[in-house]
From Swiss-Prot:
High-level lineage: Eukaryota, Metazoa, Chordata, Craniata, Vertebrata
Composition skew (Pro residues), residue ranges: 1834-1843
Name the UniProt record assigns to this protein: Xin actin-binding repeat-containing protein 1
Keyword Mitochondrion: no
Comp. bias (Low complexity): 1820-1833
GO BP of this protein: actin filament organization
Cellular component GO terms held in the UniProt record: adherens junction; desmosome; intercalated disc
Gene: Xirp1
Record-linked InterPro entries: Actin-binding_Xin_repeat, XIRP1/XIRP2
Length: 1941
């Protein structure tokens, strides 16, 4: 055993590798014990097995655990485990031996088994309890056994379930119930298994092990391989026939889909066990088989009732364990057997069943054919059974006659065609071998066919016991099989049915087709008419009407002339008569209807008089040239007519049981004269025999069973008897083919229909209600061709190919021509809502309109019946130059009209053409009149008179079966109005039906249209023609009765007729635009005004703009409005334009000046209006282009713009003061106004919405799709790594972040200040508030946002400042406000979220606070800045210190703010934050020193440039703000760092980096787009406009937020969405930063004066430039890798942010001052873009540089050049920014770089060491940024975004180390160390910083000098000097690299 186990271990390993069948038998053996324990099963009986069973279980458990072990660990444990297992198993030698033997004996089989069990979930191995449970709660679900078992056989994935089933089987096996196990495998729904044993993982332990004996294992294996599950165990496999007795069968053939429903009754008492172990007796079984060309499905339904007590011998109760389908492929017949796995009830109770009985499973049938291999009855393959069924039975169990238990139940399904129709017998009796074998098989069969099961079972012993079962050898399964297989069912009838039986037996028995004794076996049935012609019967339908005691039968034979008999192929049976046999068995009576047929050669007419004279009526309907005759044959049984009471008694009581009464009606041929034209022909009954008479009559006929019906229903209850019941059944004999449709309509009480009695018409016609569908074809003719024949709405006769029963509907046609000349404007009373399908076929344009249910539109047919119009198809027909229209109305009969329903009768169709410009629309009006307005009821029953004598089938309106020509008594009057207006002529046809007799006084004379009177009345330019169509009998055609009809028509009061006109627009859908009538437009006008007002009231509209509202599918209503006064929009212009709202929105989204954030105004059903912000546009997405708009935009479009009749949806495009386009989407209830859709990316809008719903982050708009995409990868990686917790955190964080970032980014993009405000608001307020704030912010007013904020708080500014201050003061508060971020955060999440949300939010809040403080300060400062830049510089120096500490302080007199922010930062950071803060402070000290130096320079520069560029100062402030934001972020990250110092450090760095990145991105954007430059300029302007400064600051904050997004970058690696978010955000940041610099300045100024939302305009311009530069820099972004794009965006953002900072710094720097002077003014100019571009382009080199020091130098030179200019203004922060960008781009995954950046920021004071590190890091960062942009490496950009997340997700030591190292580097740790720790990222960051620093002050502060130099260069470039500076910067960069190196 040890060895086997060993091998089993190996096998297990293998199993893990490939679950499929393990090759090693030993392993199999082991597994078998483990999973299935097949070894134990075979050897020991279940009882014995149990003791060992538990040991086995332990072994299994051990094995299960073993499987879960790591392969390495397993190696170590292998020997010990093997030994232990060997010991355990050896204790039970038999088992061990069995398993070993198993391996040896059935290696292949065992392997199969093992393979199956191996596939179980590892943890599902081995639980004793599970097994026990299974035993206790056994469920016997029904269902598709085959597919279920196939599932088990083929699926390895569902191992768990298998194991469960195995377990169950084991338990059962323990009971000796192997079959049960098999059943479980086959039939137990997987989910039920799962539920039952969801907690039991050790199911693997297959209880089978012990109970299964050696032979059984083989069976089990076979089961899985190829044999029916019953092969496994103790279940007897029984064929369906033996268990189930067919009660009834319904076959439907529709097209090529055949549906067969069989209702069975279980013969031996069968039961099913449910999960709880309760046993339910199966009352009936239904199998539904649907067979189409390729697919065949079967469903078993069991009807059960609880079996509380089993009165019968338990040995007779079979528990059905499973059902399996065995298909035996035969060349000609596909035989399928349903095999039931049954188990004697008593066997279940016995734990041990003689396993010998099941050992037959050892007969393993080898063979590749799975179906053959499948063991029948658990042990034998079907093919072995076929010849030797008895042997197999013997092998299995001695079959004792009558012993149901051992009976072989063989149920083979033959192709459905081969089953005789009489299988549909009313009640089938089960064959109980025990009792029934004594009976006559034939008799039994008959019973099956004709008796209800219940009656058979009760009466069997009495009635049928007499029959001799000698034919069937008792216990001989073979004979039974023969019985069921070969004997036609009808040949097994009761003795009483002998006549039938004999006749039916003429069909050769044994032939499978014998079962189809119906019309199929004798394919051709004919009826001979009096002419001697034969008519082939195509379908037979019988209708039985029971009204009270009277039964009437109506037989309708549909025939077609049989021109010649093809005797070679068919034998023609002439239907001579119909026999009704009433068979009574027990208390159940069944009637069988048989056709008496005579072969052609034996036709003699037995014309004897019948007491009854049912007649066969013939209807001939001419379809084309084929005459179809319908022969109607009605019976009225004598006894029901004359001896009702007696007969009733007889039927009830005196009819002897099993007595068969038969009545035969023989038809006689009718004299020729009896056949009248087209009337139905009645077959006259020559003689009606009763049974007794029949005996003596020499009728040589073959009887074919048409159908059986239970007679019990006639005696059921008196109440029922009073009702009129109608049974109708129909068999279609389709040219003798097997495929037929047999539809039975049973026992539908007529009272359920409107007219119970209407069903029985004397003439036998089908009543109107029974025809299901009418198509109303309105045939129209050109006006000039209007003839008598055209009745306007004409009913089209059924098409030739429509079969009688299929004639679904009437079709009415209405045609008009010269559409182009028919114009009229008629007020539509009602606009019919229709759905149009426009199709063009050649010259026929067809448009189908589906009518809605209310009101009902009806069309009257000739008989006056109303048909509900379900759809109208309009075809425009071009004939030459004449345009015609044809209306085809599809209808369904309108059986009953409820009072509450409005029914409009369509009288005519009117068309009017409308021309608007070059759009021509045709309007179709249906002239209707309410049904109730018909006078008196005359018109309500009009029958149109129309026998248009044309050969054309359409125009020759042949009466449908039930319509009689003679009944046409109505004239249709058409009134045509021709209205000529200019060149427009409209003709209106009014068709009215008047009873002819109302016109003539004689209804009989009307047979055809006689005249058309046209009355022209000209009034002015209106000419009215009245056409009167009158009908007269053909013979009276010449008598002109026109006047009468005219007179009649004229008086018809027009007022009485409510005319409802349905307006159908015929314009092609794509041109369906201005076709609405003016009235509608007015309505919409009102609606539009309401919409505008509503939107104004909810403050969604704050600027002038355009409101576009979805009008219909193809047009939109556009209203240009202007806000003359708040809340009072004035509509300047309104028009309907063709187009899709969605298309318009998408187009708008692609415009550059669209604000990313839009407002979503929704009105719920209660009328509450909810305003939320929606991120329409990712800034990054804007670059990405259309393909990225798909996801969120699509969702937004669908949700917002999907049409809803009750909802007004649309968008408002407002032009804000900043000239950006703001989109407001609205969805209002009909009374409410549409939302205005702010232009923007719908995706981003959606993202924004989502973001607003969650916390707003100043991150990029979350792209839903990107998020998801990213998440997929991230999740995949997480899953691969097994980091599920992270995944969860990530998920939450990423969602929040993405939302926040989406919002933040949107906000930033739209207006950083607003975003900040909204973010703050969001943080402070709840989501709705945030949404409001966002919406307001979006609305384009920072002020508005502030106002919202104020509303939520106190004063706008006060509240905002407060909140900001609050945020600054209490980062925790901010975090709290953020809430989710704070909670999520703790460590990793916090960082992520915080970086994304908290950091960003905190930073943004802090920034806002700073901004507000700065705003206040900047208001003063901006004054100071503007005026005393020196002050600014001083402040800036202070700020530098503050920035180093916390950039927050910068603008806040920078120092104060710094302190507060520092405090908040520290608070937020906590201890870790403090540590981070300390490092930050060190960095800050360095940074301050550097900053002081730089600021001194900058101050000089600023002083110099101050005049030149206050804006630059502002930008500097922005930069500082950014820095402060970064610092805040650092603090936030520090806070997050609380989780881990390393992480914190990295977070701080990341935050710094992200901030730096933001700065860099901004700078990059600025340089790329020159937007940063322009933004700087704008920012300067904004600074000048202190208000703007606040916005700039906000932008900085946003940058910070974006930086947070970069921080997120770390998360991004895992979460692509984060990645994407970050990248998107960063790109947005970049864009925004292009803008953002300006925006930052604007935000700063906005912070100062958040009211200055207008700065957004600047942001917008910058956005464009930024986007352009981003596009340039991030070429890949547009190229398509979203990730790459995101990365690039992020990189770009960081880069541009850094750049912005650098630029700002450059402005501050003296050199920068000059550059900034020119740059600030020329920020937009190419120089900055060049620098940025350079930096961005540098990325590749930078990347290389990052990767290698020398390359870094080179790229550094470039990238730093770019970065340094950007960074120069804020040397350290820019460096940081650069770093973050680089890191984001290159090492986004690594948070460390960002922390490094942060450290560099702090380090700024420490010049030399930090510069090196900074240079390295900064350079690498810049390189990264550049590289990211160039490379489009999503990961880098993302890092900035999710630093926190990243740290968390990356919480990887590396990030932390990197962060620490970065911090250390910042702290002057060895730069190389930092680089090493930070990896290239840090180096890049350091380098970037260093570059920037060195540029500024290479000697003093490397970082400063490089940055300064870079910035100066950048500015010089911008101004023209930038190039020189860049050159300088490049050199310094190399120096930096050298230093770094």
């Amino acid at each position: 055993m040890a060895e086997p186990q060993k091998s089993s271990k190996v096998a297990i390993k293998k199993m893990e590798d490939d679950l499929p069948p393990p090759p090693i038998p030993d392993s199999i053996q082991v597994i078998a014990p483990a999973s299935q324990d097949p070894n134990p099963l075979p050897v020991p009986p279940p009882k014995q097995a149990f003791s060992k069973f538990y040991q086995q279980r332990q072994v299994n458990e051990l094995k299960r655990l073993y499987r879960h072990m790591h392969p390495e660990l397993r190696k170590n444990l292998e020997e010990a485990v093997t030994e232990d297992l060997a010991e355990m198993l050896n204790t039970e030698d038999p088992n061990a031996q069995g398993s070993v033997n198993l391996d040896k004996v059935l290696p292949g089989e065992v392997q199969s088994m093992r393979w199956i069990f191996e596939n179980w979930a590892l943890d599902s191995i081995g639980d004793h309890q599970a097994t026990k449970k299974m035993m206790e709660d056994e469920i016997i679900p029904g269902g598709d056994v085959k597919s279920t078992s196939l599932r088990f056989e083929n699926q390895s994935v569902n191992g768990d379930y298998l194991s469960t089933t195995a377990k169950v089987s084991e338990t059962d096996l323990a009971r000796g119930d192997v079959h049960t196990a098999r059943w479980l495998f086959e039939t137990q729904p997987l989910d039920s298994l799962n539920k039952l044993y969801s907690d039991e993982t050790e199911m693997q332990e297959a209880v089978l092990k012990e109970p299964v004996q050696g032979g059984d294992v083989k069976g089990a294996k076979e089961l899985f391989e190829a044999q029916s599950l019953d092969a496994i165990g103790r279940c007897c496999s029984v064929e369906e026939k033996s268990i189930l007795q067919l009660k009834s069968e319904i076959q439907e053939l529709k097209g090529d889909v055949k549906k067969t429903i069989r209702l069975f009754q279980t013969e031996p008492l069968c039961a099913i066990r449910d999960k709880t172990g309760n046993i339910h007796e199966i009352k009936s079984v239904c199998r539904e088989e649907i067979q189409s060309n390729a697919v065949r499905t079967a469903r078993w339904l069991f009807e059960t009732q609880p079996l509380d007590t089993i009165n019968k011998d338990t040995s007779k109760v079979q528990i059905i364990r499973g059902i399996s389908l065995e298909e035996i492929g035969r060349p000609d017949v596909s035989g399928a057997r349903w095999i039931f796995e049954t188990q004697p009830l008593d066997a279940i109770r016995e734990i041990t069943v003689e396993e010998q009985d099941f050992k037959a499973s050892t007969d393993f049938v080898t063979g590749a054919d799975v179906t053959k291999q499948r063991l029948l009855f658990g042990t034998q393959a079907l093919d072995s059974l076929k010849g030797e069924a008895s042997e197999s039975v013997a092998a299995k169990e001695q079959v004792i006659g009558g012993d149901v238990k051992s009976t072989l139940w063989l149920f083979e399904t033959q192709p459905m065609e081969t089953l005789k129709d009489n299988v549909e017998v009313g009640h089938l009796k089960k064959v109980e071998l025990s009792a029934e074998e004594k009976g006559d098989v034939k008799q039994r069969k008959h019973v099956f066919e004709t008796c209800p099961l219940g009656s058979i079972s009760k009466a069997f012993e009495e009635e049928i016991s007499a029959a001799s079962t000698e034919e069937v050898v008792k216990g001989d399964v073979k004979s039974f099989k023969t019985l069921f297989e070969t004997l036609p069912l009808d040949s097994i009838k009761e003795v009483d049915a002998e006549p039938i039986t004999k006749e039916e037996e003429k069909i050769p028995p044994g032939n499978v087709k014998a079962n189809q004794i119906l019309f199929e076996t004798t394919p051709l049935y004919a009826i001979k008419d009096s002419f001697g012609n034969f008519h082939e019967v195509t379908s037979v339908s019988r209708e039985q009407v029971i009204s009270g005691d009277v039964k009437k039968y109506k037989w309708m034979f549909e025939t077609r002339p049989l021109d010649q008999f093809d005797e070679s192929t068919k034998k023609v049976d002439i239907i001579r008569g119909i026999t009704k046999q009433e068979v009574v068995a027990g208390d159940v009576r069944t009637a069988k209807w048989l056709f008496e047929t005579q072969p052609m050669d034996v036709i003699h007419h037995q014309a004897t008089q019948g007491e009854e004279h049912p007649s066969m009526k013939r209807e001939i309907s001419q379809r084309g040239d084929v005459k179809t005759c319908r022969w109607l044959f009605e019976t009225q049984p004598m006894h029901t007519l004359y001896e009702k009471a007696e007969k009733k008694q007889e039927e009830d009581v005196s009819v002897p049981q099993a007595d068969v009464k038969s009545y035969t009606w023989m038809f006689e041929t009718q004299p020729l004269d009896s056949l009248k034209g087209q009337e139905e022909q009645y077959l006259r009954v020559s003689k009606a025999y009763s049974q007794d008479e029949l005996q003596g009559v020499d009728v040589k006929t073959v009887r074919h069973l048409f159908e059986t019906e239970p007679l019990g229903s006639s005696v059921v209850s008196e109440a029922d008897q009073k009702k009129t019941l109608r049974y109708s059944s129909r068999v279609e004999i389709q040219s003798g083919e097997v495929s037929r449709v047999k539809e039975f309509f049973e026992a539908k009480p007529l009272d359920t229909t409107t007219k119970p009695t209407a069903v029985i018409k004397d003439d036998g016609t089908i009543e109107a209600g029974s025809v299901h569908k009418f198509t109303w074809l309105f045939e129209n003719y050109p006006m000039d061709t209007l003839k008598d024949s055209s009745e306007g709405i004409q009913e089209i006769p059924p098409e030739k190919d429509i079969k009688g029963g299929d004639v679904g509907g009437k079709r009415f046609i209405f045609e008009t021509y010269s559409l182009d000349q028919i114009h009229d404007k008629v007020d539509e009373t009602e606009l019919h809502k229709i759905q149009k399908d426009t199709m063009s076929k050649a010259n026929v344009k067809s448009c189908t309109m589906l009518f809605e249910s209310q009101p009902l539109y009806a069309i009257q047919d000739k008989e006056g019946g109303y048909h509900e119009v379900t759809s109208v198809q309009k075809e425009e027909i071009m004939k030459g130059d004449v345009k015609g229209a044809r209306w085809l109305f599809e209808t369904k009969p309108l059986d009953q009209i409820k009072k509450e329903e409005e029914v409009f009768v369509i009288r005519a169709v009117t068309q009017e053409d409308i021309k608007k410009g070059d759009v021509q629309a045709a309007r179709w009006r249906f002239e209707t009149e309410p049904l109730d307005s018909f006078p008196g009821g005359k018109i309500s029953v009009p029958r149109t008179v129309d026998d248009v004598q044309k050969g054309d089938v359409q125009s020759n309106k042949q009466l449908f079966e039930s319509q009689q020509v003679g009944q046409k008594k109505y004239v249709r009057m058409v009134s045509v109005s021709d209205v000529q207006r200019g060149d427009v002529r409209t003709s209106t046809w009014l068709f009215e039906n008047q009873p002819v007799d109302s016109l003539y006084g004689d209804a009989d004379r009307s047979s055809s249209i006689s005249t058309v009177q046209r009355e022209d009345s000209q009034k002015g330019d209106v000419k009215r023609c009245t056409w009167l169509f009158e009908t007269q009998p053909m013979d009276t055609l010449k008598d002109p009765e026109v006047t009468v009809s005219t007179g009649t028509q004229e008086p018809i009061p027009r007022a009485d007729v409510k005319s409802t006109t349905w307006l159908f627009e015929s314009t092609p859908l794509d041109k369906f635009s201005a076709s609405e009538c003016s009235r509608e437009t007015e309505l919409k006008e009102r609606t539009m005004r309401e919409t505008l007002e509503t939107l104004c009231t909810c403050q969604a509209i704050q600027h002038d703009g355009i409101l576009i509202e979805a009008n219909d599918t193809e047009s939109v209503k556009m209203v240009k409005y202007q806000l003359s006064s708040p809340g009072a929009p004035e509509i300047l212009k309104e028009e309907i334009v063709r187009g899709h709202l969605q298309g318009i929105m998408l187009q708008l989204l692609h415009r550059t000046n669209v604000e990313p954030q839009s407002v979503l105004v929704e009105e719920d059903r209660e009328g509450k209006i909810k305003v939320s912000s929606l991120q329409l546009l990712d800034q990054s997405e804007a670059i990405k282009g259309k393909e990225d708009l798909s996801g969120n935009v699509a969702k937004a479009l669908q949700s917002l713009l999907s049409q809803d009749a009750s909802i007004k949806k649309g968008m408002v495009i407002q032009e804000t003061k900043s000239e950006s386009v703001k989109m407001t989407l609205y969805s209002l209830l009909f009374h409410s106004v549409q939302q205005k859709v702010v232009k923007g990316d719908v995706k981003s809008t959606i993202g924004n919405l989502m973001a607003s719903s969650q916390e707003q982050r100043a991150t990029v708009t979350v792209k839903r799709e990107d998020n998801e995409k990213g998440n997929v990868q991230l999740f995949a990686s997480c899953i691969e790594k097994g980091d599920l917790d992270y995944l969860k955190n990530l998920q939450q964080e990423s969602e929040i972040q993405s939302l926040i970032s989406a919002q933040a980014e949107q906000g930033a993009a739209e207006s950083a200040p607003r975003a900040l405000q909204s973010t703050n608001t969001h943080v402070l307020a709840n989501k709705e508030q945030v949404e409001k704030v966002m919406a307001e912010a979006k609305s384009g007013a920072l002020e508005g946002a502030k106002m919202v904020f104020a509303c939520e708080s106190t004063g706008k500014e006060g509240a905002l400042e407060r909140e900001v201050v609050h945020a600054v003061g209490v980062t925790g508060t901010t975090v709290q406000c953020l809430g989710k971020p704070q909670n999520l955060p703790t460590g990793m999440e916090k960082e992520e979220i915080m970086s994304g949300g908290l950091k960003v939010t905190t930073k943004s809040i802090q920034r806002v606070a700073d901004v507000s403080k700065n705003t206040e300060k900047e208001e003063s400062i901006s004054a100071c800045l503007k005026e005393p830049k020196a002050t600014m510089q001083g402040i800036a120096q202070a700020k530098v210190t503050a920035e180093r500490n916390e950039v927050v302080g910068e603008q806040q007199s920078l120092v104060t703010e710094q302190a507060s922010q520092k405090q908040s930062e520290e608070k937020v950071l906590g201890n870790d934050l403090q540590a981070a803060m300390q490092s930050l402070r060190l960095a800050t000290a360095e940074a301050r020193n550097i900053q002081h130096h730089v600021q001194s320079k900058l101050q000089r520069n600023r002083e110099e440039v101050h005049m030149a560029c206050r804006q630059q100062v502002a930008s500097k402030q922005e930069t500082k703000t950014l820095q402060s934001t970064i610092h805040q972020q650092e603090s936030a990250s520090t806070m997050r760092e609380n989780t881990s110092t390393a992480i914190r450090t990295s977070t701080t760095r990341v935050q710094e980096a992200s901030r730096t990145h933001t700065s860099v991105s901004q700078k990059s954007i600025a340089s790329h787009k020159k937007v940063s430059a322009s933004e700087e300029v704008q920012g300067g302007q904004l600074l000048s406009q202190e208000n703007q400064v606040v916005p700039s600051r906000d932008v900085s904050i946003k940058d910070g937020l974006y930086t947070a997004t970069p921080v997120k970058t770390y998360i991004n690696p895992f979460v692509e969405s984060d990645y994407k978010e970050q990248s998107v955000q960063e790109e947005r940041d970049v864009i925004i930063r292009g803008d953002v610099q300006t925006a930052i300045r604007a935000l700063q100024s906005a912070a100062t004066e958040q009211r200055l939302v207008e700065k957004e305009d600047i942001v917008r311009g910058n956005l464009k430039a930024t986007l352009q530069s981003l596009e340039k820099s991030n070429v890949n972004v547009s190229k398509g890798d979203f990730k790459a794009a995101m990365i690039y965006r992020n990189a770009g953002q960081s880069y541009s942010v850094c750049k912005k900072k650098s630029e700002t710094q450059v402005n501050n720097n003296q050199t920068a001052v000059v550059a900034s002077g020119s740059q600030a003014d020329n920020d937009f100019p190419p120089p900055p873009p060049v620098a940025v571009m350079k930096a961005e382009h540098c990325p590749p080199s930078t990347k290389a540089t990052r990767e290698g020091a020398p390359p870094l130098l080179t790229s550094k030179d470039e990238a730093p050049g770019c970065f340094s200019p950007l960074q120069t203004p804020l040397p350290p922060p820019p460096s940081l920014s650069c770093k973050p960008s680089d890191q984001n781009s290159t090492e986004k995954p690594k948070i460390p770089p960002k922390p490094e950046i942060t450290a560099p920021l702090r380090k700024k004071p420490v010049p030399p060491p930090k510069p090196e590190h900074l240079l390295h890091e900064a350079y690498s960062a810049s390189t990264n940024n550049s590289t990211n942009r160039s490379t489009k490496s999503v990961p880098p950009p993302v890092p900035p975004k999710p630093p926190g997340l990243r740290e968390i997700s990356m919480p990887k030591p590396p990030p932390a180390e990197l962060q620490l190292s970065c911090t250390e580097v910042c702290e002057q740790s060895d730069h190389r160390e930092s680089q090493d720790k930070c990896c290239t990222l840090e180096s890049s960051m350091d380098k970037s910083i260093t570059v920037h620093g060195p540029e500024r002050k290479l000697p003093k502060y490397t970082a400063k000098t490089p940055l300064q130099m870079a910035e100066e260069r950048y500015k010089a470039r911008k101004g023209g000097q930038g190039k020189f500076e860049l050159d300088r910067a490049k050199p310094s960069k190399p120096v930096k690299n050298g230093e770094v190196g």
